[in-house]
Amino acid sequence: MSYKLDQLTRLPENKKCFDCDAPNPQWASCNLGIFICLDCSGQHRGLGVEKSFVRSITMDNWSERQVKMMEVGGNSNAKTFLSTDPMFSAAGSIREKYNTDIAEDLRQKIRAEVDGVEWVKVDRPKSVSSHASVTSSSTVPTIPSVSKEANDKYFAKLGSINSQRPDDLPPSQGGRYQGFGSSNSVNPNSSARNNGGSFLDQLSSNPVSALSHGWNMFSRSVSQQIQDVNKSYIQPGITKVQDPETRKDYMNAINNFSSNVQEGAKQSFTQLKSFLDENVYSENPQNTRGTYDAEIDSPYSALAASPPPEDYSKKNFDKHD
């Protein structure tokens, strides 16, 4: 550390961090001419060297120019200069403070004095507030209508192809794909056919609604099974849980339930994917398959590809006895 720099650190105004008043700051921002603590120096580094060129007072080598910047600067001079702008005083974070016009004026003023030239304040247009910038940048972009039209055409094609298949044959033999209901008010005790046709039939009229309703039906089915397990197994026998044999029966029931849910999801997902492979991708090998794979995989494949349920019947529950 140079003698001049050592003398600057001994001045009373430089014995506290400029930003947080922590004692004995061991870091400095050359182009701002201020002494700062370790914590604040990390935030200053995040501003970039154009905004704040951070150096360690004891561990870094200093050039004569850098030391001179600290001489013409200093915490006291910086405070006097920056406090004239209400925006700097009102700023909440280090990033906000040193992205103000007054902070840029300080950098230019120090540079001019080190170069031995007169500093002239530059008039700048009023900058947009940081709050407005954040609000603008965080606005969710709207989805282009072209994308929606392309999706509608794609799913309409699926519905048209499926409607031409015979409904008296299974899908594996070229028959029509049946599946999820198409109405939110579907009676769970009635078939999908009696409640508006199959899932793929509805794609031709309202693709987005069909996909949404299909997943809602599946979700309600799973939810109903969970309620059945709770009503049939858990609630009636809660007082018997201390019996080892009873606990074993409970765990076997839960394992079977979990396996059934997973297998149901896998079958439904496989059926839909098979239809796409047979009718869309086979006709147009150049079709952008990844886009629709991602859209269709999102709810179904997550369940179908999940790991097997843990066998709770093998767990040791003695600690609850």
Swiss-Prot record:
A GO BP annotation: COPI coating of Golgi vesicle
Alphabetical list of InterPro entries matching this protein: ARFGAP/RecO, ArfGAP_dom, ArfGAP_dom_sf
Location of this chain's protein in the cell: Cytoplasm
GO molecular function terms noted in the UniProt entry: GTPase activator activity; zinc ion binding
Entry keywords, A to Z: Cytoplasm, GTPase activation, Metal-binding, Zinc, Zinc-finger
Residue ranges of the region described as Disordered: 160-201, 281-321
Protein purpose: GTPase-activating protein for the ADP ribosylation factor family.
Name of the protein: Uncharacterized protein C622.14
Protein species of origin: Schizosaccharomyces pombe (strain 972 / ATCC 24843)
Lineage, highest ranks first: Eukaryota, Fungi, Dikarya, Ascomycota, Taphrinomycotina
